[in-house]
Amino acid sequence: MEPQKIDRRRNYIVMLDTETANDLECPLTYDIGWAIVDKWGTVYRKRSFINREIFFLEKDLMQSAYYAEKLPIYYKRSANGESKVANWQTIKNILWQDMEEFETKIVSAHNARFDYKSTSTTQRWLTKSKYRYFFPYGTEIWDTMKMARDVIGKMPTYRKWCELNGYICKNGQLKMTAEILYRFISGQEEFDEEHTGLADVLIEKDILAYCYRQHKKMRKKLYEN
């Protein structure tokens, strides 16, 4: 499907996902994807970038990547142009330009705390803390995991489905990963998340849209109790 033209009557959201190397205390982004969407999940623009400074220049770090077995995928995507290779500052500039063009200050992610941390950590690591923040000042961070907990997690059908399939955490809570939520909302019970930036964005925007369609009260902001 071709990206939609900008409709100035709509409010836009940047749905974003990162894949990282290094440890969870200092995650460094090598893959970042985002899509400009509305709350119904319509896609207006898609972006996929490989961070040159981490992926190609930090080869030892890349061997620590959680999904290191997927690295050949990125070489193929960089070769065929499916993902653009760029320096971090260029990626940041393009994101800021997209946010300005679509007049949005909202960035949403699934488990947004991690993506906010990974982009901030990468920004500080590459600039030696000269520049500390990746997103424009005043950006509002949304978390589809919070939305899903408030909407999908309260549905008796979801609880029954999780119990039937064994999607229960050790503490008894229902699992809320993007992969499992997408299996539920799509009916594709064999679905496996790709764990690459843009591909994951395109299922996470469906989670956002599903939550909106239920017309239930839900928290959206990352730092909202």
Task: Give the positions of each predicted feature.
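Short alpha-helix plus adjacent loop in nuclease-associated cores
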Residues: 142-169
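Conserved non-catalytic scaffold segment of RNase H-like nuclease domains
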Residues: 2-122
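Substrate-recognition/cap helix-loop segment adjacent to the acidic, metal-dependent catalytic center
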Residues: 114-142
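Acidic, Mg2+-coordinating catalytic module of metal-dependent nucleases/exonucleases
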Residues: 106-113, 117-118, 163-225
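A short, structured active-site edge motif that brings together acidic residues
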Residues: 48-53, 134-152
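Hydrophobic/aromatic-lined pockets within catalytic cores
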Residues: 123-127, 152-156, 186, 209-216
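Short, polar/flexible loop-turn hinges at active-site or ligand-entry regions and domain interfaces
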Residues: 78-81, 129-135, 188-193
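Generic enzyme active-site microenvironment
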Residues: 15-17, 141, 204
